[in-house]
Amino acid sequence: MKDYLALPLPTSSPTPSGKTLLVWGGSTSVGCNAIQLAIAAGYEVISTASPKNHSYLKRLGAVEVFDYNSPTVVADIISAFKNRTTAGALSIGGGSFKKCIEVLGGCKGNRFIAQATFDVPSSGYPKGALDFPPFMLQVAFTMISGKIKSKRNGVSSKMINGSDLQGNEVGKAIYEDFLPQALADGTFVPAPEPQVIGKGLEKVQEAMEMSKKGVSAKKIVVTL
């Protein structure tokens, strides 16, 4: 979208832009699809994931994938961008925003971060009504500190509002003009792969618990 990364719309025959997009959190549902859409828009993609998912993201088209838990991940990605021009970054997952700030602060090109998620405080999500006010205060503090860090590094950002796709040109271009043919000819694949837990409403709680524990490169599914 124009007020985010402003990438061209995806096509079946993209013109190479000569630029590289950083997708932090590539093994998530958002990340897997972002990688493919960016490539279809003419961009090279560098991503992050746990080592077990590196080969999967490369099959989706990422040229390089780094371990987000590595203590040298920021320096490693900056090094990978040494002879590249950044198209910006998409931050997905806890801690991703500040890491992306550090990376883009050391790169040439578009220093803009499209935020798909906000950082959850270390205390986790509120478990009851009394936990909600301090939770929101911690979230606000995290967001403000992130904005300050962005400014110091010459980086700008904006939180993504998914509902915007319903009222602008991007939603139609992707869901009506691009995806039907791309899915049919295999240039875009549904990702991540589904992990079916079982059938029936009685399996929903099990699926929720599994999702809460954390999954990567999988989409938890309950059939009805």
Stretch-by-stretch model annotation:
Residues 1-224:
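Terminal helix/beta-alpha structural elements that buttress the NAD(P)+-binding lobe
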